[in-house]
From Swiss-Prot:
Pathway: Metabolic intermediate biosynthesis; chorismate biosynthesis; chorismate from D-erythrose 4-phosphate and phosphoenolpyruvate: step 4/7. It holds the Pfam family Shikimate_DH. The keyword Membrane does not apply. The gene is aroE. This is Shikimate dehydrogenase (NADP(+)). Involved in the biosynthesis of the chorismate, which leads to the biosynthesis of aromatic amino acids. Catalyzes the reversible NADPH linked reduction of 3-dehydroshikimate (DHSA) to yield shikimate (SA). SUPFAM superfamilies: Aminoacid dehydrogenase-like, N-terminal domain, NAD(P)-binding Rossmann-fold domains. Homodimer. NCBIfam families: aroE, PRK00258.1-2. It catalyses: shikimate + NADP(+) = 3-dehydroshikimate + NADPH + H(+). Shikimate binds at residues 25-27, 72, 97, 113, 232. Its EC number is 1.1.1.25. InterPro entries: Aminoacid_DH-like_N_sf, NAD(P)-bd_dom_sf, SDH_C, Shikimate_DH, Shikimate_DH-bd_N, Shikimate_DH_fam, Shikm_DH/Glu-tRNA_Rdtase. Belongs to the shikimate dehydrogenase family. It comes from Shewanella sp. (strain ANA-3).
Length: 292
């Protein structure tokens, strides 16, 4: 009797998201759906990294065969510092949400948050060309979105923040990009001095999570203004409720941005960008069920 030849099952390509906390993460579900849609075979898990142990957790993951990783709060800046090479978006954002282990063993970092935002905005609003846009907030979420918005050819990008100097610092940084190509489109304005109606208002702050609002004048909202909150939930966020009360034409939450940035990450790793509409509907339905 001859021995049957042994058959080895190839190891799954492993991916993960690192954060702390991480139990709430929808990334494993999203990437699992993307894998099914694109007929890719892979695994994707959520990893709780110790606050003081992100680098060790990440390197252990890569040493064990990990191919790529997403990074969420509070580790995006640490991930940036660990990269051997970076995309233009990541370099200017000063933060990374997507890591790839390259064939030579080095780590490449990208920031797909802004790309996900712009993809979702275009899906809802069409072209962003020539639009007058207000970006509320000057933290990491805002910083990661500025270059993609400028590349989408917005007409004007006004940045406002409770601390005016932080908004001005971002304008100073991005005014230098590509030999000042975007300098005439960028402006920092204090919240109390905002004037005129905007075509699009984007809230990058997390104020809605606490049911709070940035101190904005209702005069910035017109009957054709679209408002976008990067936060999301089963019900309209506090910011989007306020925008509707001021007569905004349309309000959009950040669930599509979450799915959009995941699709960009998936494309970086797998070479194919999945359609997001079906996954977005599944997540939206799940939010409603979980809220009941």
């Amino acid at each position: 009797m001859t021995d049957m030849p042994s058959v080895t099952t190839p190891a799954l390509d492993r991916y993960a998201v690192f954060g702390n906390p991480i139990g709430h993460s929808k990334s494993p579900f999203i990437h699992g759906q993307f894998a099914s849609l694109t007929q890719q075979t892979l695994s994707y898990e959520a990893i709780l990294a110790p606050i003081d142990g992100f680098e060790a957790s990440l390197r252990a993951f890569f040493q064990a065969g990990g191919k790529g990783a997403n990074v969420t709060v509070p580790f995006k800046e640490q991930a940036f510092a660990l990269c051997d090479s970076l995309s233009a978006e990541a370099t200017l954002a000063g933060a990374v949400n997507t890591l790839s282990l390259l064939a030579d063993g080095t780590i490449y970092g990208d920031n797909t948050d802004g790309l996900g935002l712009v993809a979702d905005l275009v899906r809802h609003l069409g072209s962003l060309q020539h639009k007058r846009v207000l970006l509320v907030g000057a933290g990491g979420a805002a910083r990661g979105c500025i270059l993609p918005l400028l590349k989408a050819e917005v007409g004007q990008l006004v940045i406002t923040n409770r601390t005016q100097s932080k908004a001005q610092a971002l304008v100073d940084i991005f005014s230098q990009v590509q030999e000042g190509r975007y300098s005439d489109k960028l402006q920092a304005v204090s919240m109390s001095e905002l004037s005129g109606v905007f075509d699009l208002v984007i809230n990058s702050t997390s104020a809605s999570l606490a049911g709070e609002l940035p101190p904005l004048s209702q005069s910035i909202i017109g009957n054709k203004t679209a408002c976008y909150d990067m936060m999301y939930g089963a019900k309209p966020t506090a910011f989007n409720q306020w925008a509707l009360q001021q007569g905004a034409a349309q309000v959009i939450d950040g669930l599509g941005m979450l799915v959009g940035q995941a699709a960009k990450s998936f494309a970086l790793w797998r070479g194919v960008e999945p359609d997001t509409s079906g996954v977005l509907k599944l997540l939206r339905d799940k939010l409603q069920v979980d809220a009941q």
